[in-house]
Amino acid sequence: MQDNTGNDHKYQSQNPIGGESLSEMTSTLQHDLTFPQTVDMQAIISETRERVRRAVKTGTFISAESSDELLRGHLNSKLKLIVLYVDLVGSTMMTRSLPVAQLALMVQTFTQEMSFTVSRFNGYVLKYVGDAVIAYFPADANYNDKCNAAINCSDAMIQVLEEGINSVFREHDYEGLQAKIGIESGEHSVIQYILGSNPHVDVLGYGISMAAKLSTLARPNQVVISHGIYFGMHPSFRKKFVQMDLDPQRWKYIHERFQPGVWRSLPLEDGE
C-alpha cells in the first residue's frame, strides 16, 4: 500500500472530508499528528464479561449515558462529527430462528456493550436503529485525535464481541455475535422534534447516512472508512487498512472531490 505519510499536510489542505475541504472542516486541525492514546483492553473485556454474565443470569441490562444533554446545547446549529455505525450481523436470520427471549438477550447485549465501548473512547451514542448503534465523536476541534478515537473504538468493539460477549455466550451454548462497522465524518444539523408531548433531539447529515452505507461494504468483524477518516487518523493506523476496488456502477458514492476512496480493515494478523 502506498505510503502517504509524507504528504499528510498537502493532502489535508487540498482534499475534502464529507463534502468539505479539511481547512473548512475545522479551523483547529492539528499540523502535527499526535500518537493515538491507548486504553486497557483487558479491563474493558473483563467489565464486559461481568455485565454479560449478569444479563444472561438475571436479564438485567445497564443503560449507557444519553447524549441528549450535549446535543441540546447545540439545537438548530451544526456540529462537525465523526460518525460510527455498528450493525449486528445476521439479525434477520436470528428473528426467524431464535426464541424471542434469546433474541432479545442477544440484541440487548450487543447494543449495551457497543454503547459502553463507545463511552470508553469519549464518544456518544446518538440512537439505536433496529439492531444497529449510531455513535459519534464531536470533531469541531482536534479532528485527528477524534479520528484516532473512532478507529480505536471500532477495533475495541470487535475485541469486545469476540473476547467479551462471545466468550460468555459460548459458556451457555449461544451463537457468537459479529458486527459490520462504517465510519465517516461531516457537518451535521442538530434538530428537535416532538413525539406526543416529549421533545427528542436528533442529528441529520451526510456522515450518518454515509457511515451506514459504508457498513454494508464490510465483511463480518470488519471496518470500512472514508478517505477523510483514512487521512485524518494517525499514519500508524493506515497499515491496518487497504483501499477497496469498487465498481462505480454498483457503488455510486465514489466522487473525485467528495469521496475519492474507501478503505477496509485488514485481519488483525495482516495489519500488524
Task: Kindly label every feature range from the protein language model.
Residues 69-149:
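Catalytic NTP-binding/metal-coordinating core of nucleotidyl cyclase/transferase enzymes
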Residues 107-114, 154-162:
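Short, hydrophobic/amphipathic alpha-helical packing segments
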Residues 106, 205-206:
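Short, glycine/acidic-rich beta->alpha junctions
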Residues 184, 206-231:
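Catalytic/regulatory signature loops of cyclic-dinucleotide turnover enzymes
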Residues 121-146, 165-204:
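Catalytic core of nucleotidyl cyclases, primarily class III adenylyl/guanylyl cyclases
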Residues 1-67, 220-272:
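Intrinsically disordered, glycine/charged-rich C-terminal tails and inter-domain linkers
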